[in-house]
Every structure is written in structure tokens, then in C-alpha cells.
Amino acid sequence: MGKYVVIDLEMCPVTSEKRRNFHCRHEIIQIGAALMNEELEIVNTFSCYVRPAFGKLDPFIQGLTGICWADLKDAPCLKEALQQFFAWLPEEMVTAVAWSGTDESQLRREMECKNLSMEGFSVRVGSWVDCQAMFAGKMRIKRCYSLQEALIASDILSEGRAHNGMVDAYNTALLFRKLLTEEEFRLNPYYEEAHRPGRGSTLQFSLGDLLKGLDLEPGLSA
């Protein structure tokens, strides 16, 4: 078992007018990552804001991510941010993990649109693992789960703000470790009861009920 790097990208929308010159609907504004060793321990984290060249940091994205223009105006461009990311990665090749396939496709598409070489990326990062698909397989239900729902369902609660790239990467790493190491995947009992057959699709318990008795994972350091 080799090393894993769990990657989470935060993005902002690109207006239709700007897409005439930049053929992507979104643009990366933060790269977050968590590095896992061979024992699936989280040994390091990475976060870098990225200054968008075409995207617009609108109020919705600001509210969702907590990212403001002050964080981005002096941030590196994507090329420089990726150079920092590659310098942070270990020298040996790692397997990339992301909550869904969106991160890989966005990164590849944006690098292509900005004429950035994929050579260095391909040398350092091997295959990609779709953690959302792994989780859906364990749940045996074909639908798209949000990361936040998957964490609650899996009895994982970590400190930090959702939709922050580093926090989401860290939380995805916790879930990925559980998916790989638990032969019989254990759910939060309140979540499991709320979703047992016959109860329908409406959640029968409050969020407070779901959080009772959670095994708290070590949080991110301040």
C-alpha cells in the first residue's frame, strides 16, 4: 500500500461572457490536500488560495466557502499554486483521492485551458480514487451523497468549516481510511435507523439526534 494524497478543490463560477476566452464553467480558487502514509495516517496538510483570472467570487461562493477577495487578490495563479503543491508532495508517486470525480476533471480541464503542462502532474500523481463512489458502494444505494452527509452517516465528526479545501480534504481522508479499514462498515445508528427500509425518503430524526454518540476524530490543529 503506497501513499495517498487526498485533494479538494474550491471553485468559483465563470460568467458566460468570460467563457468566450476561457472554456470552463468554473475556476479553481483553493487547493486543499491531506497526505496519508502507508498506514493511512494523515501526516501533513496543504492549503493554497489561487487567484482567478476569469472567475467571479460571488456572494454565494463567499458564503459557502468563507473565501473573500482579500484571500485571493495577492494569491498565486494556478501555475504557481501547482508548483507549490508539487513541491509539497513526496518525491515518490502517490495515488490521488477526491470526494468525487469533479476535482480531477476540473483540474485537467483547467490546466488544458490555461496551457499548463500535465507532465509534472502525471509523474507525481498516479491513478485517482473516487471516494464518493466507494461510499455509495458500501451503502448499496446508487445516488450522490454530499461529503457532509457521508461523514454524519459514517460516525465521523471533525473540526473545521465545510467547503474549505483543506478541511474537506482532511475529512475525506478520515472517511477514506474508514472505507478501507472497516470490513463491516459501521454507520451512525441514528442515521441507519432513519434510513431503514419502510421509513421512506424523509429523514425522521433531527441533526442533534444524528450527532449523539459520535466517535469524535482528532480535529485539525489551530
PLM regions with names:
Residues 2-109, 160:
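Conserved non-catalytic scaffold segment of RNase H-like nuclease domains
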Residues 7, 129, 167:
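Active-site flanking residues adjacent to catalytic metal/cofactor-binding acidic residues
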Residues 11-13, 133, 171:
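Short, glycine/acidic-enriched loop or turn micro-motifs at the edges of active sites
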Residues 56-58, 62-65, 72, 132-169:
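Active-site-proximal helix-loop-helix substrate-binding element of RNase H-like nuclease domains
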Residues 102-127:
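Substrate-recognition/cap helix-loop segment adjacent to the acidic, metal-dependent catalytic center
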Residues 110-114, 137, 153, 178-182:
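Active-site catalytic microenvironments for nucleophilic, acid-base chemistry
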Residues 122-144, 197-200:
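Short, flexible loop segments at boundaries between secondary-structure elements
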Residues 174-222:
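Acidic two-metal-ion nuclease catalytic site recognized across multiple nuclease folds
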